[in-house]
Amino acid sequence: MTMLWVCLAGGLGAVARFLLDSRINSRFSVPVPLGTLVINVMGSLLLGLITAAALNHLGFSQNLKEPLGTGFCGGFTTFSTASVETARAAYGCGRRVGALHCMGMAIAGVLAAILGLALGSRV
């Protein structure tokens, strides 16, 4: 049954990513794809919160960890799209822009995950 919930949550995460990415990229015209950056950082924060809540047993059911963490966050965030968009930014805007985009996303994602773990531990 858990696998079914992971699949359903993953589908919801993918739809949420599509809608949010479309909305962000239609509103902001920047040289790098802002939508994927925002989504991956948000997903890192959310996964940190989920992980901390599950590890600390803060009223968070272990049955929700896989569907929300692996399913929703896995469907919501996207490493492959980020990789392609970074390569396109490097090709279209220069290697420096591509490298900054890549490093910025990685650093922001890790910091967001740390923040999520910290916040989730205090709830």
Swiss-Prot record:
It catalyses: fluoride(in) = fluoride(out). GO terms for cellular component: plasma membrane. Na(+) is not transported, but it plays an essential structural role and its presence is essential for fluoride channel function. InterPro entries: FluC. Its main location: membrane. The keyword Ribosomal protein does not apply. It is a multi-pass membrane protein. The chain crosses the membrane at residues 1-21, 30-50, 99-119. GO terms for molecular function: fluoride channel activity; metal ion binding. It comes from the Bacteria. One of its GO terms (biological process) is cellular detoxification of fluoride. It is found in: Cell membrane. Na(+) binds at G74, T77. Keywords: Cell membrane, Ion channel, Ion transport, Membrane, Metal-binding, Sodium, Transmembrane, Transmembrane helix, Transport. Coiled coil: none annotated. Belongs to the fluoride channel Fluc/FEX (TC 1.A.43) family. HAMAP family: FluC. Fluoride-specific ion channel. Important for reducing fluoride concentration in the cell, thus reducing its toxicity. This is Fluoride-specific ion channel FluC 2. The lineage of its organism: Bacteria, Bacillati, Actinomycetota, Actinomycetes, Propionibacteriales. The gene is fluC2.
